Each structure stands twice: as structure tokens, then as C-alpha cells.
């Protein structure tokens, strides 16, 4: 079964176990790239560690087409469903 991007975004919130921080950052970056496109926002301040991590993860996806980011997001969500259950 292949999920749509919207279904994957909804399903990831129902995982039985919370993904690791690295997995959450990957999800965030692919979601933002798949919905917004390249990161053009200002980098958060040096004391905003969580914001900087999220910003950097998204910025690393720069140049990835929205469609490709959405496909990668769905694939990652499907892996997480297999790993953690939904």
C-alpha cells in the first residue's frame, strides 16, 4: 500500500511509538521541502538549538523538487509505520 502525501502526514501523527529525534528532523525537512520548497527563511539565533536543527535539516534539502520530497516523505513514513506501528 502506498500512501498519498496527505495521508502520510496524517498517519505519522498516529504512530504507536514516537520516532527518534533524527527521524523527526528528517520528517520535518522533507515535509517543509515538499510543501514550501527551498528554505529561504533566516537562520534562528544561536540560543534556539531546536530551531537551528530544524532549519539546518530543511536547508540540507535545498534543490530537491517538491514532488521528490513528497515521495521521500511518504517512503519514510511507510518505513516508520513498519518500524513503530500506526
Swiss-Prot record:
Record bears the keyword Translocase: no
Job description of the protein: Binds medium- and long-chain acyl-CoA esters with very high affinity and may function as an intracellular carrier of acyl-CoA esters.
Family: Belongs to the ACBP family.
This protein's record includes keyword Thylakoid: no
InterPro entries: Acyl-CoA-binding_prot_CS, Acyl-CoA-binding_protein, Acyl-CoA-binding_sf, FERM/acyl-CoA-bd_prot_sf
Origin species: Caenorhabditis elegans
Superkingdom to which the source organism belongs: Eukaryota
GO process annotations (BP): determination of adult lifespan; fatty acid metabolic process; lipid storage
Gene Ontology molecular function terms on file: fatty-acyl-CoA binding
Keywords on record: Lipid-binding, Transport
Residues that coordinate or bind an acyl-CoA: 13, 28-32, 50, 54, 73
Protein name: Acyl-CoA-binding protein homolog 1
The ACB domain, residue ranges: 1-86
Pfam entry (one): ACBP
Amino acid at each position: 500500500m502506498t500512501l498519498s502525501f496527505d495521508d502520510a502526514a496524517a498517519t505519522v501523527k498516529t504512530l504507536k511509538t514516537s520516532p527518534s529525534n533524527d527521524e523527526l528532523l528528517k520528517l520535518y525537512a522533507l515535509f517543509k521541502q515538499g510543501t514550501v520548497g527551498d528554505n529561504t527563511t533566516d537562520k534562528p539565533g544561536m540560543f534556539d538549538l531546536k530551531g537551528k536543527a530544524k532549519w539546518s535539516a530543511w536547508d540540507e534539502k535545498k534543490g530537491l523538487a517538491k514532488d521528490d520530497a513528497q515521495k521521500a516523505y511518504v517512503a519514510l513514513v511507510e518505513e516508520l509505520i513498519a518500524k513503530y506501528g500506526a
